[in-house]
Amino acid sequence: IDSINNIDTLIDEKGAKSEQDIVGRVYEYFLGKFAATEGKGGGEFYTPKCVVNLLAEMIEPYHGKIYDPCCGSGGMFVQSVQFVESHKGNKKDISIYGQEQTTTTYKLAKMNLAIRGIAANFGDVPADTFFKDQHPDLKADFIMANPPFNLKAWRGPDELTNDPRWAGYEVPPTGNANYAWILHMVSKLSESGVAGFVLANGAMSTNTKGEGEIRKKLIENDLVDCMIALPGQLFYTTQIPVCLWFLTKNKKAETIPGHSDSNHRNRQG
């Protein structure tokens, strides 16, 4: 009860909060508390709100299809909807697609959005994104994600070596899934799609087992918009510094969903 009293459910300057918003704040509060208590295990499904806010502000998902291939408890989607509504938009203008492998976390995500009245497609079952893609034909306008940092043994030595998601690039190494996540997200972007995601800082400079070649090719293909280094100690899972990556599928397009030309130029400058 004392914990609930600490949650911001007061009326703000814009008027009374809806019951859905209040319940959503309570749910979000306890997700954060649980993640802090569980440490590494809890952090697998929870991304700090300040990081999610920054991603949303950078990619500006006003309308279109939003995708998270490792959606955890669904925080990226909640913040996307809040971003749209705070800019006088309509949450019905966005369509949400997510995937989560862990059964419990999959249920947490569905509940997180359901209590807020947010429609979402999480696929039929919890599943591994690399081996059982729940949205095989999806082309997303926006991707927001916080993949597991430096995931090891994500595939066997002879598995997924000819996967079409790696076409034109080196095959991501078995010992670290960071670049597999990147290439998966690139494959999911629409022709003018934008992606913003979190990775360990090492992803910006690694040259291990073809990762440097993949990064070089991403730059040569003019996909990398910018990278932002963040301070350490932001996550419950790790104390190492992290970075944000932003990819744009077609920088030469006259318009990108949710972006004005001036905003897009400013981001690249």
Predicted regions and their residues:
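Long recognition/docking surfaces used for binding and targeting
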Residues: 1-35
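Active-site lining segments that contact anionic ligands and/or coordinate catalytic metals
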Residues: 139-140, 176-178, 192-200, 224-225, ...
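Conserved phosphate/pyrophosphate-binding and hydrolysis machinery centered on Walker-type P-loop NTPases
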Residues: 16-24, 41-49, 175
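Conserved S-adenosyl-L-methionine
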Residues: 41-145, 150-160, 165-168, 180, 223-232, ...
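Glycine-rich S-adenosyl-L-methionine
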Residues: 164-189
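Flexible, glycine-/basic-rich loop-and-beta segments that form/coincide
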Residues: 235-269
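Short glycine-dipeptide loop
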Residues: 62-63, 189-195
